[in-house]
Amino acid sequence: MNEINQRLESLREVMRREHLSAFIFPSTDAHQSEYVADHWQGRTWISGFNGSAGTAVVTMKSAALWTDSRYFLAAEEQLKGTEFQLMKLKIEGTPTISEWLAQELQGENAEVGLDGMVNSYHETMGLIADLRKSGGITVRTNFDPLGLIWTDRPAIPANPVEIQPMEFAGETVASKISRIRTALRQRHADGMLISALDDIAWTLNLRGTDVHCVPVFVSYLLISSQQVSLYVDSAKINDEVKAYLTENGISLYPYNKVAEGLERYSEYNILLDGDETSYFLWKTVKCQEIIAGKSPIPAMKAQKNDREIAGFRQAMLRDGVAMVKFLRWLKPAVEAGGQTEISIDRKLTSLRAEQHLFRDISFDTIAGYQLHGAIVHYEATPETDVALKPEGLILIDSGAQYQDGTTDITRTIALGPVTEEMKHVYTLVLKGHIQLELAKFPDGASGTQLDALARECMWREGYNYLHGTGHGVGAYLSVHEGPHQIRMEWKPTPLRAGMTVTDEPGLYLSGKFGVRIENTLLIKDYQTTEFGKFLQMESLTLCPIDLTPVDFSMLQPEEIEWLDTYHRDVFEKLSPYLEGEDLEWLREATRLVDRVMSSGR
């Protein structure tokens, strides 16, 4: 019996003792985070699947894991040899968790368990309603079996908190809290609980290292009309940060006392976001009225101020320098032999680490060679790592956390000769990428309304990709930031000037190769006419796009013009920071398209 199946047996012993028919493990923590500290990696521990999104469900006789298209291939590999059955979200015929449980527990007097501290209020209430409809299955929300069976479970992290200087933050804590309180008054709320860690870090101009690749710290923030209370482990707070918080009128309380703080909130109306607040904490509130609604903070955080935008530009310059040095090194190193997916990841990270204000990578690098490139969120391990050859395509999706900005970039590189199919698919992705960057659109249009621009050239040939086309990017915060997105599914959040968003269409041919090209963009003003205000997008990312696999006959004149303009901008901005072979490589990589075509590459 392998380790995962042994853990399932231990879990079932506890379930039997607690009279539970099933237990649900989400991917989230007590703050509904996408990326979580090791302490809350319960779904990974019980299933072996380490993707950032997914839900594991275990009954006394079976086990299943639901995840989205980014992780289908990775999940298939990681679940091999375990009892877990892969459930592919948004694929026809895939049951919901409630439907599957209703079928699996049919005829039982069943009770399903979950930990109400790590499941959101909205998801839990939806599950309770669905299971009730599906045959009277009840849900127990106050039990965490991991506390009994995960004997070497990591502690909740207690790493030091740091102040994010005004030169990078661009807005004082007092100003942010004032804006939040104004938004609360407009909703007739006296206060709100903030659970989302990046929202807390942004509001207080603080950063931490509690979560891998995301500069946040585990805490809660309770804002009322008269007081601001930070619930955090005191071990994180040094004298400098404590004085800073006192200066800004922030009271400190122990992290594990947040429920008591909410219980005292009985005389006021409180705003709670059911997607970000845990079921347990929501049920703790005893105030006159809970005002259910979206937190105002993500929309504020999404529109970057002038200093944040300036920080992004500087971070992208340094990141571009690191990327050019890496790409100049890559092909000769592969030709010399001895390079693998893991070794080039280490090389790229080392080049970024040389840059000023580098703090960390912004997510685990995706370096997928050939067929591994078709795994959307592939992560090389010692077991899957492969040697690189001077042929075919490698997809490299990577990013960094600099103190003045967060980067996210994908380049697909031809390491040598490529097939005609590779050229065709690569060029389709490039066309989609360019068409989105060329967009001009009304202020307030949604990302869903723009999404088809990146896909239309692919749809005409029967291709598609199932992940989103773009997401927001934090200012030295999470590389995935909302509330805006560019995706097929309806997402009505308006796009506004000052928002950052990625442009990352891709195509993935299972068992063959994958292609993705990604820049981080800034939404900014375009023009105002009698029909209103219009916006456009500017690429913040500065790195050549590989022209070797391009079929130029597929490109329209405006697409060629965009490539030339972009590469001219990349050269002008990066060349002052490069010399020798790196500078010559950049000059060659940013040649005008007609020169590339006339030279036969």
Language model features with spans:
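Active-site neighborhoods and metal-handling regions in enzymes and metal-associated proteins
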Residues: 1-601
